[in-house]
From Swiss-Prot:
Keywords: Amino-acid biosynthesis, Branched-chain amino acid biosynthesis, Leucine biosynthesis, Lyase
First-tier enzyme category under EC: lyase
Lineage: Bacteria, Pseudomonadati, Pseudomonadota, Alphaproteobacteria, Hyphomicrobiales
Annotated catalysed reactions: (2R,3S)-3-isopropylmalate = (2S)-2-isopropylmalate
GO CC terms in record: 3-isopropylmalate dehydratase complex
Biological processes per GO annotation: L-leucine biosynthetic process
Annotated source species: Parvibaculum lavamentivorans (strain DS-1 / DSM 13023 / NCIMB 13966)
Entry similarity comment: Belongs to the LeuD family. LeuD type 1 subfamily.
Identification of the protein by name: 3-isopropylmalate dehydratase small subunit
Role, per record: Catalyzes the isomerization between 2-isopropylmalate and 3-isopropylmalate, via the formation of 2-isopropylmaleate.
An example Gene Ontology molecular-function term: 3-isopropylmalate dehydratase activity
Amino acid sequence: MDKFNKLTGVAAPLPIINVDTDMIIPKQFLKTIKRTGLGKNLFDEMRYDDNGNEIPDFVLNKPAYRNAQILVTGENFGCGSSREHAPWALLDFGIRCVIAPSFADIFYNNCFQNGILPIVLPQEEVDKLMDDAERGSNAIITVDLEAQEIRGPDGGVIKFDVDPFRKHCMLNGLDGVGLTLQKEAEIATFEKKLEETQPWL
């Protein structure tokens, strides 16, 4: 998992509440177990018409937001099924941070496990960032995880909270496997001792 320290990039506004995981990545794209290649189908039913042509009015199809790395959106983002393909699709598109008033619990946890920083803010602060994001290619926002600050294009600073353990994992690029490997020496010692004391196992 890539480390997340400080991210400066374009923020895309998606002022929709209750965006579920089927909207993020529809079920027909869940056959793969690869984490790559799903970005092209992110928000598929909102990005493309029935003929597969881009819908120009959808935010991520607009030139200013095609390379967005931050998504500012509505409450209860990521509700619905627990498919891990949802954060995979966001990450493959290039989204490393999602800011919303609230998230579905499973999606929220899956984001941290896949290197995406989900930030919960009060509605009024999300509204402010949404207004900033409407500036298009001028909507450059900096998310500083170490300082737990978001800096808007006007220089304003918004503080955010994050669990210390999750923060440590994001700063150091540690998912479940990475955390386990940190204890590789201790695990090897334990297994050797177990083999010596209980050879019948």
